[in-house]
UniProtKB/Swiss-Prot annotation:
Record's keyword annotation contains Lipoprotein: yes
Name of this chain's protein: Variable large protein 7
Primary role: The Vlp and Vsp proteins are antigenically distinct proteins, only one vlp or vsp gene is transcriptionally active at any one time. Switching between these genes is a mechanism of host immune response evasion.
Lipidation (S-diacylglycerol cysteine): C27
PROSITE patterns linked to this entry: PROKAR_LIPOPROTEIN
Organism: Borrelia hermsii
Lipid-carrying residues in chain (N-palmitoyl cysteine): C27
Protein family per UniProt: Belongs to the variable large protein (Vlp) family. Alpha subfamily.
UniProt keyword annotations, A-Z: Cell outer membrane, Lipoprotein, Membrane, Palmitate, Plasmid, Signal
Membrane topology type: Lipid-anchor
Annotated compartments: Cell outer membrane
Top-rank taxon: Bacteria
Name of the gene this protein is made from: vlp7
More details: Genes for both Vlp and Vsp families are on (usually) unnamed linear plasmids in B.hermsii HS1.
Length: 369
């Protein structure tokens, strides 16, 4: 009998322990009061997240990521048009505008009951205005990128063996200016400078892939069928960050190639093209510059890549377009990453100033929040 009672007690103890663990896990999964389970922001609102005194600035950034989650991660495909990429940029710009509006509400609440003549001296208003200025800059240039395309597919390529077409000059300038200003806004906000690509067209002393640059030819001969694989190899040797760095370090007025490319040839010059002989004249050009040129040609109005064979053959238009799409996506991810890092830094700075201002104030009652 004692053994049976002891066994029953042991089972009860085990059951109680299991129930306790389950309850603890369940409680741990519940969002804290005033927070959402995903973003960490109050009701998923960016402005409310910034007003959570003592909370990490990460909460505000998560609220921003939640706000733009239906836009981030856009990936171009073979049937994606350049205008559809523009739609992505316009949507991202609109989300940056929404974030700015959320921030404005923080300042409006901070000014409630305050003499408006002193509003310019309100530290919360100042913090919000500084953050909004950066978001406004990003929004403007992101939306500018929304206007650089046309109805042709991303990576548009010649459907037969033949040269390509340079990107429209006005739209190429607009793309260059927008990317340059987005990166400038990032570095001004404390984001680490972009990595500069040092890899040449003969990566690590290996295969010489200079003929891959011929898919950017706009005159002379067209690339050979085997050259397209070399273009893909050039692209795979660099990161999107290195491509973006090469583009923004170009000169707005860099010209189409009139002589053999070298280590100083910019992404803008490669995007504008030239003869196949000049494009593939040496293996010293930077791979990031060639890849950046391919990405720009693939995204900007009237840009068309050269092909080495009939559309569906090896080295033909479809294969070339695949390289163009991959280059475009690498660049898009890099731009998106820069924007996210910039917003994160801006929100951290605003949060720090807002917390400092609120910490020096009298506690605010729940009814007045």
């Amino acid at each position: 009998m004692r053994k049976r009672i002891s066994a029953i007690i042991n089972k009860l103890n085990i059951s109680i322990i299991i129930m306790t663990v389950v309850l603890m896990i369940g409680c741990g999964q519940q969002p804290e009061a005033g927070k959402t389970g995903v973003s960490g922001g109050v009701n998923g609102n960016l402005g409310n997240s910034l007003m959570e005194l003592g909370r990490s600035a990460e909460n505000a950034f998560y609220a921003f990521i939640e706000l733009v989650s239906d836009v981030l991660g856009f990936t171009a495909k073979s049937d994606t048009t350049k205008q559809e990429v523009g739609g992505y940029f316009n949507s991202l710009g609109a989300k940056l505008g929404e974030a700015s509006n959320d921030l404005e509400q923080v300042a409006v609440k901070a000014e409630t009951g305050v003499d408006k003549s002193d509003s310019s001296k309100n530290p919360i208003r100042e913090a919000v205005n500084e953050a909004k200025e950066v978001l406004g800059t990003l929004k403007g240039y992101v939306e500018s990128l929304g206007t650089i395309g046309d109805s042709n597919p991303v990576g548009y390529a010649n459907n037969a063996a033949g040269s390509g077409t340079t990107a429209a000059d006005d739209e190429l300038r607009k793309a260059f200016k927008a990317l340059q200003e987005i990166v400038k806004a990032a570095t001004d906000a404390g984001v680490k400078a972009l990595k500069i690509g040092a890899t040449t067209l003969q990566a690590n002393g290996g295969a010489d892939n200079k003929e891959g640059a011929k898919i950017l030819a706009t005159s002379g001969g067209n690339p050979a069928a085997a050259d397209v694989a070399k273009a893909a190899a050039i692209l795979s040797s660099v990161s999107g960050e290195e491509m973006l760095s090469s583009i923004v370090k170009s000169g707005e007025n860099d010209a189409q190639l009139a002589a053999a490319a070298d280590g100083n040839t910019s992404a803008i010059s490669f995007a504008k093209g030239g003869s196949d002989a000049h494009l593939a004249g040496a293996n010293t050009p930077k791979a990031a510059a060639v890849a950046g040129g391919i990405a720009l040609r693939s995204l900007v109005k009237t840009g068309k890549l050269a092909a080495g064979a009939a559309d569906n053959a090896t080295g033909g238009g479809k294969e070339v377009q695949g390289v163009g799409v991959a280059a475009a996506n690498k660049l898009l991810r890099a731009v998106e990453d820069v924007i996210k890092k910039t917003v994160k830094n801006v929100l951290e700075k605003a949060k720090e100033k807002i917390d400092k201002a609120r910490g020096s104030q009298e506690p605010v009652s729940e009814s007045s929040k």
